[in-house]
Amino acid sequence: MTSNPLDESMESLTVVPPAASPASRILVVEDEAVIRDMVALVLQQEGFTVDVAADGRTALNYFRSDSPEAGSVTENPDLVVLDLMLPAVNGLDFCRLLRRQGVTVPILMLSAKDTETDRVVGLEIGADDYLTKPFGTRELVARCRALLRRSQNQPAETPAVLRYEGLKLFPEECRVLLDDRELTLSPKEFRLLELFMRHPRRVWSRDQLLEKIWGIDFMGDSKTIDVHIRWLREKIEANPSNPSYLLTVRGFGYRLG
């Protein structure tokens, strides 16, 4: 009979007082229902909002604001508790995909594998912490809180370069490369693209884009956005009429990827 991975033998572990916001949202990605439900229950009892996914592909949808899993939530989860061995998209590939898209959400990886190599690979791929099964629920909660504190207290940094697939944008230099070929963009085109690249997959309405780029005092038409998106597509898309970077979300606005 398989032992319960949520071993409660760590009675001597010091209980860490709550430090993270009770509104913090945690995504639990685990294919074993017993473990998934138990982890979700423990975190909910600690005051967190919890979403669950049984595989990596479903979990990735929580980072797309137009997906059914994300619902009405427009922000990414604050933390991901991620099993290493998952169907569809495994834990390592999940980390790679998120980090490649510029998503910096803290990730706590869970695994029955306990070799140094496994831990190092997980951390180098993009996980922020690694917890070996079986584990105590107190340690799980303590590690979640530590990761949330670290991410909430970390000052926002302006990266030297923003990357999305073949695009590279240098904020300080106002330069954009597409497949290492430099592009010539107007100031508004540059700021639009920078906003999209800082928030990949987030859907922006025309009004939101106008306020962010043109300012709240702008008195023009929202079709200004459509015109600038068309110009951007002509510069970054292989086929502007069938874009792969700047996508239209019908009835709402635009997103990158």
Curated annotation (Swiss-Prot):
Keywords tagged on the record: Activator, DNA-binding, Phosphate transport, Phosphoprotein, Transcription, Transcription regulation, Transport, Two-component regulatory system
GO MF term list: phosphorelay response regulator activity; transcription cis-regulatory region binding
The UniProt record lists the keyword Magnesium: no
One of the protein's GO biological processes: regulation of DNA-templated transcription
Residues with 4-aspartylphosphate modification: D83
GO cellular component: cytosol; protein-DNA complex
Family annotation (Pfam families): Response_reg, Trans_reg_C
PANTHER family: PHOSPHATE REGULON TRANSCRIPTIONAL REGULATORY PROTEIN PHOB (PTHR48111:SF40), REGULATOR OF RPOS (PTHR48111)
Purpose: Member of the two-component regulatory system SphR/SphS. Response regulator. Involved in inducible production of alkaline phosphatase in response to phosphate limitation as it is directly involved in the regulation of phoA transcription in response to phosphate limitation. Binds to two distinct sites upstream from the phoA promoter.
Protein name: Alkaline phosphatase synthesis transcriptional regulatory protein SphR
Organism of provenance: Synechococcus elongatus (strain ATCC 33912 / PCC 7942 / FACHB-805) (Anacystis nidulans R2)
Taxonomic lineage from the root: Bacteria, Bacillati, Cyanobacteriota, Cyanophyceae, Synechococcales
Gene from which this protein is expressed: sphR
